[in-house]
Amino acid sequence: MASAATIETEKYSLLEDFNVDVEVDDEEYESFSLCFWVYLLNSTTFPSTIIRQVHSDMSVSAPFLVLDENKKMMLLPLTLLHKEAPDPVDTSSWTQVPSVSTKSKFPLEKWVHVGCEVSRNFMRLFIDGNMEGEQFVTSLLTKNAYPECPRKISLFSVGGDGYSVQGFIQCAEVLPASDHVEHHYMKDPPLMLSVNKSSSSGIKLDDCGVWQASCKEMFSLDVLLSNAIGQPVHKDVEVVASLLYADTLPEAKMGEAEAPLLIRDEGVQFSSDDRPIKLLNGRSSFKLKISQLSSNSDDRLFWIKFGIRNAKDYPFLQAVSNPIRCISVSPEVQPVSVTPKRLTNIDHLSSTESPDLLQNTSSVKRIRLGKESVSGSEESYQQCNSHPQTSRQFENGNGMRLHEEDNSSIDSENSEMRYTISDSTIFKYCLGNLIDKALLLKEITNNSSDDEVLEFANQVSLYSGCSHHSYQINMARELIAEGTNAWILISRNNQHVHWDNVVYEIEEHFMRISKCSSRSLTHQDFELLRRISGCYEYITQENFEKMWCWLFPVAYSISRGLINGMWRSSSPKWIEGFITKEEAEHSLQGQEPGTFILRFPISRTWPHPDAGSLVVTYVGHDFALHHKQLKIDNICESSERYMDAKPLQDMLLAEPELSRLGRIKRSH
């Protein structure tokens, strides 16, 4: 039987790898069309440059295809052909030159066909085979004029981790004038897995429009494999269903007695992991049931995730259902309230945690490591792996908390309390993506007292089952205020500031917030910060805010608890600076098992629940590289609470997987 290899995954590539050259002096390409399919992730921010242009006479590249602040795509003149082309040095000039723009917002998490038709006298922009607009321009070139001028231009994307645009591209081609954009649109559309939400059965809707499924009843969802223009695709592939926690994204796991998600096939129930379903004519119906995970799972939100078996981990070859609230139904139970209930403490492992590293067999808590979740979509909620704070907590000698369940009932008077910040706002925050969360927190901190923000943080932690949300919410007011003041000092009312003039102010703020004046940031640190901001020679407020949402949580973490001492240490240098996952992996190539490097992951930006966290990258006993997030209760509490605690480095070296500190190898 054919496998998932029947899907040609090699034709999909990262947007950051896109690069084509065009010979505009070639008679066939005096007018040309750049055509491609693009899939942008939700982590894309606006404004952003999708494709840039450069030729041999340019020292700095200029934008060619951009997304503006209103999420509309704009096609700009070509520097080699058009007098109206944007100035590569003046980053604001592209907003002032003639351009062709889409009429509506550019969609994310969806395949879109883009066609850019360029000639010496006009430009046309096509979306999904339809012309969005046309702009006439003035030609710079004439026949046999300026023979010394370059005739080849490169079009490329910068994309990638830490930049503002991340996504995938397929079937990118430069076509001569004789080929039509519409033909390319129909030629080889990319594939996409989806859930047909309109055909679901056994699912109920509450008053908020949230799906509800009983732990005791089957429900069905149809999964479709189609191309980007909506045609069913007949591929001999199998699809596997799994259950995810909607707040933290790891797979739901129970003991060995029962699987969290069951599937019925030929009248028999199986664990969904053990029973992939084959697609027939591009479609299959999944009959599913969520197990009775525990009484504490009532009202908790889940997603059903579908993925093609043995296929690469592309987001467009995966699909998720709407959030589903798992409820228990019995004659004695009253109808479920629309308001989410508080979650009691559920102490379970996510699918990506390592049990041997998490297990505590003594009265003294060890450091806890949880595997870092790596995903193309930054706004998707990465693994948080924290516990709801609904238990009584006692501290041991290391300042780390042991949990004791409190089974006493909640006082009826307290359960009826109403706070200024509504339950619907709390619910919206729990379900929102990172951009939604950030906007909500800005509004809440502007209109609420400190006590109200603290109560909001506690409620979000209870409803979502993730205490790390509380940490990000509680720092929101300070993060926003510090960032606003920093930009005022940096910009001095200028919209664009040269990067060299920003470095000093950034370092001053970082050293003050991190409470560590003895260690300065290095050139490599600033280069990574510039990469995170997405800027080049000049930085805008949008660039600064992207960088600040990563830097502030890191500085905040360094100022607290056990990390501060490690950051201050110069011999050995436990945390060498701001490094990428790729740099850490490169440095550990060929090292002995147990060698490790500590880093702040650049994919975690505020208000992600793990923003500012530390990740340990190490060589395992299998000589493979592993990435795990440090899991220490109260690691970001004030350092005064750790006067009797062991140094963090001692606790790290006590881990069986870790034995020696590695060093960073720079490629330059």
UniProtKB/Swiss-Prot annotation:
InterPro entries: ConA-like_dom_sf, SH2, SH2_dom_sf, STAT
GO biological process: signal transduction
Tissues with expression: Expressed in roots, leaves, stems and flowers.
Designated gene of the protein: SHB
Annotated Gene3D superfamilies: 2.60.120.200, SH2 domain
GO molecular function, one term: DNA-binding transcription factor activity
Residue ranges occupied by any SH2 domain in the UniProt entry: 574-642
Post-translational modification summary for this protein: Phosphorylated on tyrosine residues.
Keywords tagged on the record: Phosphoprotein, SH2 domain
Keyword Phosphoprotein among record annotations: yes
Signal peptide: none
Keyword Flavoprotein: no
Name of the featured protein: SH2 domain-containing protein B
Region (Disordered): 373-411
Biased composition range(s): Polar residues: 374-396
